[in-house]
């Protein structure tokens, strides 16, 4: 990875008249902005369909795209919708934040109109798309149709045990026939998503921009992935988890974090040649140029919490697949680059695995200025083979961090980076990352805009109000792109 820089910006955060960012004009405009600003990378959050809590890290599928991101204007230009139909629903009144409730109420109703007009018209192209994605699409479409049939209940709560347990092909065929219309509908939504995504990705590449995508290490229990292939997870005979994922107690959380995701049966995966992971990375490789593996430490060892425990306190560490998996992925995907999200308290096992993997790890500037202890996140401690971030989606924007952090930590940052009010606090922190030896520097869009309270993407461990932040129309000014471009060139990162 050559010396370069990029911007972290979720698709959901793009401006749009339809309540949430889409793969339409604003996405193309953002690619233009990145080019004008001298950037080389657009880092995104996961693109999958969101479920309870609206988190892109808890998706119904490791392969599918989020139907919310299908752009209505593109569908209208293609004759699948009318402008009046696109404008009719109430998409929410706050342009700064997504109202997921209103999106859920109206989006699928609108998209079903497009399906009614396009299913037969696009039959040949749909058939080709379905053939190319035969490994996951039929299970996903049936899973979503069944969820809708059973009132959006998790598959673990479906009343038909034969279907829940996938007893035989006959029961699956029964529901494919019973729910044929919905199976076709959810198939068509994926066809539309990937058609729009491919066009956008090609345009982004034409601008000289590469895409970094986030890959959550775990999949959601309520997902087509677990329902379709339960043999690769630590489940009992009734498909109830034996243990679930989380992290142990630490300085910040006395009870640890109980994520609740099912854990992988690494022995079963190893016996299968890690085929499940090869298929998953192959799917991600159709979306992204670089893949950031979230919670990389889970490949070294993972925290297993007995199912039913109210907190993560009573878990234990279990060895992960280590280099057996990583060597397999590196061998299968030489064209892809990986980033290891190795944040948290380092252990010798994780550090060794990172070195052996050859993947760059992460440095976060907001973690650098702890006045109580010397930090490996300070830029002078970097080696080039790393990725420097101002913060991730789980961090406050810099302007908000300045308000929340201990005064001594802010003072440490001011002294270390010679920050001044004339330059601007957030610009000085960005300068610290830009000037570092890290191969790649990435800043949140909120940080370039100097946004503070009310503009955080996610607060880990909380429910409600997360994943809603949006860019306002007009905030990507020419003056901003010029300033970013100048700093990018000054520190030798310009594309």
Role assignments for model-derived ranges:
Residues 1-82:
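Trp/Phe/Arg-rich N-terminal binding region typifying the photolyase-homology
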Residues 10, 54-194, 219-442, 446-453, ...:
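Alpha-amylase-like alpha-glycosidases and glucanotransferases acting on alpha-linked glucans and related
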Residues 25-32, 195-203, 277-279, 425-429:
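Short alpha-helical segments and helix-capping/turn motifs at coil-helix boundaries
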Residues 35, 197-205, 330, 354-355:
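Surface-exposed amphipathic alpha-helices with a cationic face
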Residues 42-46, 204, 210-216, 284-298:
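Short acidic catalytic loops
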Residues 186-219:
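Conserved, well-ordered alpha-helix/loop/beta-strand core segments that scaffold catalytic motifs
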Residues 474-495:
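Terminal-tail/helix-coil boundary detector
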